[in-house]
Amino acid sequence: MRQARAAVDAMMGFYDRSTGRWEPERPWWQSGNALQALLDYMLRSGDTEYLWVLDHTVEIQRRVYMDGEFRSDSTDDTAWWALAMVRAYDLTGHGRYLDIARTGAEWIGGYWDATCGGGVWWDVPQRTYKNAISNELYLKLLAALHNRLPGDTSYLELAVETWRWFDASGMLNEDGLVNDGLRHCVNNGGETWTYNQGVILGALVELHRATGDDALLAVARRIATATTTSEYLSPGGILTEPSEKVGADDDAPSFKGIFVRNLDELDRYVAERPYRSYLARQAESLLANASDGAHRYGIHWAGPFDKADTARQASAVDLLTTVL
């Protein structure tokens, strides 16, 4: 736990109290993702020294864009914050966080239409792209809400509908990996970003918890195994973002943390813990090869250290939390 706490402390070094964001110049959604990493750490470890960050961040950020309530110009940005609110509920038991998450789900659902047979649009209000991440996040959010609201049927119905659409969309390719999205309503062959392989795992765990349909876990395990054994995404057994090789943009350094967070959810849900050794190997490599010596970690988990920022550090916190 000491290494995870040190990584959290280093991540908090990027937090700006005046704006309620981690590195305000970075993409807004990454503060929602960093908040989730912090909440996951607190929930797993029982260490709540930074609990004050939750309400401080939420009360500022929920009013920042558009009409408030974490609305943005893309549905995935809203979904990251909504899922963090689900985790805030798990940690505190306070229903107001679920209320925020429900507001997010309803807003995202407003961008579902019949184009390509269903699915939510990524970009709003333009509506030019239906992609994997927005629909994976929406699915996970719907199923998570159902599982936390006794007597619910509406979120479950929407979750099942979303999964049926996603499963039929063609975004899951023949290699068992998820491509980025659709072009003319067919798989666009886009990059297999690690977070697209991850969020769907957590979504299917939540949906299996709701339905008991073992076919869902079979799909999740197929994607997880394809990712963890891929020479493209896990060369030498260490998770690697495709863009690491050419220089990652501002978003990509967050992706591996999102993958391992959701892989851990699957691993802890399945009795035999099939991905425990993989997660342990990632953490060992991170600690040995990716640090600057001050508990800050770069994007290359196999090394060498490149630089420190919120996205890289939140991914490290995600990873070290999985092995607590």
Task: Describe each PLM feature range.
Residues 52-144, 157-160:
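Extended ligand-binding groove/face enriched in aromatic
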Residues 92-95, 145-154, 207-214:
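Inter-helical turn/loop segments and adjacent helix faces that build the functional surface
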